[in-house]
C-alpha cells in the first residue's frame, strides 16, 4: 500500500521522449482539443489503455464473472458515449481511439455546443466558473460528461455570461445561428 498523502500518477509518460512523429501527432491533437499540456493527453491515453487492457483480459476470461465484468465495462463506456454501438463487443473496445474519449470532455462539448468561440475560450469559461452541468458549477475542463448530462450544459445562472447582451455571448450565439 502506498502513502495516502502521496497519490500515484494517473498517467504514463511515453517510453522515448523525442520521437518526432509522436510529438507532431500530440501537438495536432492538443491544438484540436485545446489541451494545455501533454499531461492532459497522457491521462486520457492511459485511461484508454486501461479500458483496452481490461477488454483483452476479458476476451480470454470465459467464466460467468468475466461476462458480468464485460457488461459492466460496456455500461461504463456507453454511459459516457465513448462506445456508441448498439450491440458492443470487446473488439469494439479494442478499436477505440483517443479522440473518442477527448470528444466527451466538458471543454470539447462546450466548444461544440457553441457556448464558446474556440476550444481555448471554452477552457477559460470553465476554469473561471461560467459553465454549469445540471445546475452545478464545474471548473474542470477534463470533466467527462455522461450522456444524461449532455443536454444540461449551460451557463451558470449568476454568471455575467448568462446575460443575453454580453458581448462574448452574442458573438457565440450569432455564429451558431448562421
Swiss-Prot record:
GO cellular component, as recorded: small ribosomal subunit
Matches recorded under InterPro entries: Ribosomal_uS4, Ribosomal_uS4_arc, Ribosomal_uS4_CS, Ribosomal_uS4_euk/arc, Ribosomal_uS4_N, S4_RNA-bd, S4_RNA-bd_sf
GO BP annotations listed: ribosomal small subunit biogenesis; translation
A molecular function GO annotation: structural constituent of ribosome
Chain ranges of the S4 RNA-binding domain: 104-166
Gene3D superfamilies, per the entry: RNA-binding S4 domain
Top-rank taxon, per record: Archaea
Pfam families noted in UniProt: S4
Keywords: Ribonucleoprotein, Ribosomal protein, RNA-binding, rRNA-binding
Family note: Belongs to the universal ribosomal protein uS4 family.
PANTHER family documented for this protein: 30S 40S RIBOSOMAL PROTEIN (PTHR11831), 40S RIBOSOMAL PROTEIN S9 (PTHR11831:SF5)
Function of the protein: One of the primary rRNA binding proteins, it binds directly to 16S rRNA where it nucleates assembly of the body of the 30S subunit.
NCBIfam families for this protein: PRK04051.1 (NF003139), uS4_arch (TIGR01018)
Quaternary data: Part of the 30S ribosomal subunit. Contacts protein S5. The interaction surface between S4 and S5 is involved in control of translational fidelity.
Name of this protein: Small ribosomal subunit protein uS4
Phylogenetic placement of the source organism: Archaea, Methanobacteriati, Methanobacteriota, Methanomada group, Methanococci
Gene: rps4
Amino acid at each position: 500500500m502506498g502513502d495516502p498523502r502521496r497519490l500515484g500518477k494517473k498517467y504514463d509518460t511515453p517510453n522515448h521522449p523525442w520521437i518526432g512523429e509522436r510529438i507532431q501527432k500530440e501537438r495536432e491533437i492538443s491544438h484540436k482539443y485545446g489541451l494545455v499540456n501533454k499531461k492532459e493527453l497522457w491521462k486520457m491515453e492511459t485511461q484508454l489503455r486501461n479500458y483496452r487492457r481490461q477488454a483483452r483480459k476479458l476476451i480470454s476470461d470465459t467464466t460467468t464473472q468475466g461476462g458480468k465484468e464485460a457488461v459492466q465495462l460496456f455500461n461504463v463506456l456507453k454511459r459516457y458515449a465513448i462506445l456508441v454501438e448498439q450491440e458492443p463487443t470487446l473488439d469494439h473496445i479494442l478499436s477505440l481511439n483517443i479522440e473518442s474519449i477527448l470528444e466527451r470532455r466538458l471543454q470539447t462539448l462546450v466548444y461544440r455546443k457553441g457556448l464558446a468561440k474556440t476550444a481555448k475560450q471554452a477552457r477559460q469559461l470553465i476554469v473561471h466558473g461560467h459553465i454549469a452541468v445540471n445546475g452545478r458549477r464545474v471548473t474542470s475542463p477534463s470533466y467527462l460528461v455522461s450522456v444524461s448530462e449532455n443536454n444540461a450544459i449551460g451557463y451558470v445562472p449568476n454568471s455575467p455570461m448568462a446575460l443575453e447582451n454580453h458581448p462574448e455571448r452574442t458573438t457565440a450565439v450569432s455564429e451558431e445561428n448562421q
